[in-house]
C-alpha cells in the first residue's frame, strides 16, 4: 500500500491558514483519486518534535558506549526512532508551512534535523554524501505575505524552500514539487483569489502525485 505522509508545520491560530486550507484541498482530492492509499498527518506543533538537545546528545553518547539510559533518555530516543521510521516508511511526503522571516518555521527545521541521519536517509562516501531515498516524492506547500517566486520579486531572500529542496536532494529525492500561495498580506484584497488559485493547482496535482 502506498503511504502519503503530510507534515503540517503551522501553529494553531484563530486566523484561517492559507497553507492548511490548500493542503486540505490537496488531501481531499488525493483521497478521491487514490482511495486505497494510506494517509498519515503529522502535526509538528500539536505533537511536538522530539528534541535535539543536551539530553539527546548525552543519550547518544551513553548508547554508543553501552551505558544505561535514564527513562527520560530512553523515551526521547524512542520518539526519535519512531518519527524517523514514519518518515522512511512514506512513499510520498507533503510539507505544509508558512514562511517565517524568509525561512521555515523552527519546528520544521527541527524535524529536518531529526530526519537527517547518516546511513538512514543518506550515507557518506569517498565522493561525498549519497542519498538513500531516491524513490520518494515530495510536495512543498508554502504561504507567504509577500511575493518571492515571481519574476523580479526578491527571490534571493526566500531561503526556506531552497533549504528544504536541498535537504531532500541530500536524501536522494529528485521528484520535488511546489505550490506557493503568496502576496496574502501585500495585497489583502487578492487573498481569496490567491488561495483559490492554489487550491485548484493542488487539486490538479493530487491526481498525478
Curated annotation (Swiss-Prot):
Keyword presence, Ubl conjugation: no
Cofactor or coenzyme needed: FMN
EC number assigned by the record: 1.6.5.-, 1.7.1.17
Top enzyme category: oxidoreductase
Reaction catalyzed: 2 a quinone + NADH + H(+) = 2 a 1,4-benzosemiquinone + NAD(+); N,N-dimethyl-1,4-phenylenediamine + anthranilate + 2 NAD(+) = 2-(4-dimethylaminophenyl)diazenylbenzoate + 2 NADH + 2 H(+)
Molecular function via GO: electron transfer activity; FMN binding; oxidoreductase activity, acting on NAD(P)H as acceptor; oxidoreductase activity, acting on NAD(P)H, quinone or similar compound as acceptor
Residue positions binding FMN: 17-19
Pfam family, one: Flavodoxin_2
Cofactor comment: Binds 1 FMN per subunit.
Top-level taxonomic group: Bacteria
Keywords: Flavoprotein, FMN, NAD, Oxidoreductase
Family: Belongs to the azoreductase type 1 family.
PANTHER family per UniProt: FMN-DEPENDENT NADH-AZOREDUCTASE 1, FMN-DEPENDENT NADH:QUINONE OXIDOREDUCTASE
Function text: Quinone reductase that provides resistance to thiol-specific stress caused by electrophilic quinones. Also exhibits azoreductase activity. Catalyzes the reductive cleavage of the azo bond in aromatic azo compounds to the corresponding amines.
Quaternary context: Homodimer.
Protein name in the entry: FMN-dependent NADH:quinone oxidoreductase 2
Species, as recorded: Lactiplantibacillus plantarum (strain ATCC BAA-793 / NCIMB 8826 / WCFS1)
Amino acid at each position: 500500500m502506498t503511504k502519503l505522509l503530510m507534515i503540517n508545520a503551522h501553529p494553531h491560530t484563530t486566523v484561517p491558514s492559507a497553507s492548511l486550507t490548500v493542503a486540505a484541498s490537496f488531501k481531499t482530492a488525493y483521497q478521491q483519486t487514490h482511495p486505497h492509499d494510506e494517509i498519515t498527518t503529522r502535526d509538528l506543533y500539536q505533537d511536538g518534535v522530539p528534541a535535539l538537545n543536551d539530553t539527546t546528545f548525552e543519550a547518544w553518547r551513553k548508547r554508543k558506549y553501552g551505558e544505561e539510559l535514564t527513562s527520560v533518555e530512553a523515551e526521547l530516543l524512542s520518539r526519535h526512532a519512531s518519527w524517523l521510521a514514519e518518515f522512511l516508511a512514506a512513499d510520498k511526503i507533503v510539507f505544509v508551512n508558512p514562511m517565517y522571516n524568509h525561512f521555515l518555521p523552527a519546528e520544521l527545521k527541527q524535524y529536518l534535523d531529526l530526519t537527517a541521519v547518516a546511513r538512514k536517509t543518506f550515507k557518506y562516501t569517498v565522493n561525498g554524501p549519497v542519498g538513500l531515498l531516491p524513490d520518494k516524492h515530495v510536495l512543498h506547500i508554502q504561504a507567504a505575505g509577500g511575493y518571492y517566486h515571481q519574476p523580479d520579486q526578491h527571490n534571493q531572500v526566500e531561503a526556506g524552500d531552497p533549504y528544504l529542496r536541498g535537504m531532500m536532494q541530500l536524501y536522494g529525492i529528485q521528484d520535488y514539487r511546489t505550490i506557493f500561495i503568496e502576496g496574502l498580506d501585500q495585497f489583502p484584497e487578492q487573498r481569496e483569489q490567491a488561495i483559490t488559485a492554489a487550491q485548484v493547482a493542488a487539486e490538479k496535482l493530487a491526481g498525478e502525485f
